[in-house]
Amino acid sequence: MTLKNRYKESIRPKLLKDLGLKNIHQVPKVVKVNVNRGLGEAASNSKALEASLNEMATITGQKALVTRAKKAIAGFKIREGMPIGCTVTLRGDRMYSFLERFINLALPRIRDFRGVNPKSFDGRGNYTVGVKEQLIFPEISFDKIDSIRGMDITIVTSAKSDQEGKALLQELGMPFSKN
């Protein structure tokens, strides 16, 4: 059973009851997932940007968008319009597919993994987790990468509070640490 079907058939009715909501449409749901990677070295190394775009496309199944500098910062040696990262916004079936792979396959492959930090909510029910290396995703092989790069994964929910967001992610299978 896919994560999307599990959400519709068992998680949504359970959350409706647990959160004491009156309408099925009030139940929090995952709106989108943003996968973002900042590349400081992209200003000087164009191969890093190309490799990063390919990795993001492999991991998410969707072409990455190049993010560019809004203004020049001399200290970082960047000029306005220079590529400084890449991002992918996932919605719909691709989002659920990515979340399922991230929660069930990628997170358990992190070294010394004891769960994700339950304090990484933003106050509005959205959750962000930073990944230190792309090798946790089974689609990426160690032989094909030029260097280890991390990424930020933000799960945007329709939850009104952090408690609702946490309840939703726990039901989806997100392994929160106990501390």
From Swiss-Prot:
Record-stated family: Belongs to the universal ribosomal protein uL5 family.
Function, as annotated: This is one of the proteins that bind and probably mediate the attachment of the 5S RNA into the large ribosomal subunit, where it forms part of the central protuberance. In the 70S ribosome it contacts protein S13 of the 30S subunit (bridge B1b), connecting the 2 subunits; this bridge is implicated in subunit movement. Contacts the P site tRNA; the 5S rRNA and some of its associated proteins might help stabilize positioning of ribosome-bound tRNAs.
Gene Ontology terms describing biological process: translation
A single GO cellular-component term on record: ribosome
Keyword tRNA-binding: yes
Assembly, per entry: Part of the 50S ribosomal subunit; part of the 5S rRNA/L5/L18/L25 subcomplex. Contacts the 5S rRNA and the P site tRNA. Forms a bridge to the 30S subunit in the 70S ribosome.
Keyword DNA repair: no
Pfam families referenced in this protein's UniProt entry, alphabetically: Ribosomal_L5, Ribosomal_L5_C
InterPro entries registered for this protein in UniProt: Ribosomal_uL5 (IPR002132), Ribosomal_uL5_bac-type (IPR020930), Ribosomal_uL5_C (IPR031309), Ribosomal_uL5_CS (IPR020929), Ribosomal_uL5_dom_sf (IPR022803), Ribosomal_uL5_N (IPR031310)
Keywords attached to this entry: Ribonucleoprotein, Ribosomal protein, RNA-binding, rRNA-binding, tRNA-binding
Protein name: Large ribosomal subunit protein uL5
HAMAP family on file: Ribosomal_uL5_B
Disulfide-bond pairs as recorded: none
